[in-house]
């Protein structure tokens, strides 16, 4: 496992690059999972120069150890990890965390793999060989997007059918089945629907609302998020009763929604 930079050598490294942090803001922590030693060192060196803390690991065991002991802001996963499948790391992390996940890969960026990874919870893709400047830009986008999904001061709760979405706690609860975990994109997309029930929302509107920013899969990204939400909300995702398609226009949420503002309920 490689951790970089240390507090002692960081100041000399940052002078070579650009630091966009606010005064007093801690270093953003990137956790990289890649068994390619040369790639790990390249990413560590470049991100260090640009004011990031980077922890690089080679397998899921080291990844889990770091994740359990440190605060991580972005995860970068190579799909090809020798004897391991990077998609399993994506699947396990997305099921329990909203940390943005960027996938890097050389020979597994077919459309099917992209769709599968999006369904599992990945946020972005970049193919090897890639521009290190583009890689840095994608990390910065992921960091700009993440604060928009945190609504800790919003005390509203949305109730529909037997579901309740609590914004402050970021929890989706079912009377029948308990809590259902949502990724950041799923949470934002569901909130967009609940704020405008029965209004048809275009893909562009949903893209903005859910903060999905992967140009390579622009149209498919919303469709994949819709599919994931249907699987979690609908009794029969193939015949949805809540999230419905408006042919040629977008999607709409077909249910009565009640909103509670910290105890006061409104339709």
UniProtKB/Swiss-Prot annotation:
One of its GO terms (molecular function) is phosphorelay response regulator activity. InterPro entries: CheY-like_superfamily, OmpR/PhoB-type_DNA-bd, Sig_transdc_resp-reg_C-effctor, Sig_transdc_resp-reg_receiver, WalR-like, WH-like_DNA-bd_sf. Residues 155-255 bind DNA. Residues 29-143 form the Response regulatory domain. The modification 4-aspartylphosphate is found at residue 78. Its main location: cytoplasm. Keywords: Activator, Crown gall tumor, Cytoplasm, DNA-binding, Phosphoprotein, Plasmid, Transcription, Transcription regulation, Two-component regulatory system. Phosphorylated by wide host range (WHR) VirA protein. One of its GO terms (cellular component) is protein-DNA complex. It is found in: Cytoplasm. One of its GO terms (biological process) is regulation of DNA-templated transcription. PROSITE patterns: OMPR_PHOB (PS51755), RESPONSE_REGULATORY (PS50110). VirG is required for the positive regulation of at least two vir loci encoded by the Ti plasmid of A.tumefaciens. PANTHER family: DNA-BINDING DUAL TRANSCRIPTIONAL REGULATOR OMPR, REGULATOR OF RPOS. This is Regulatory protein VirG. The gene is virG.
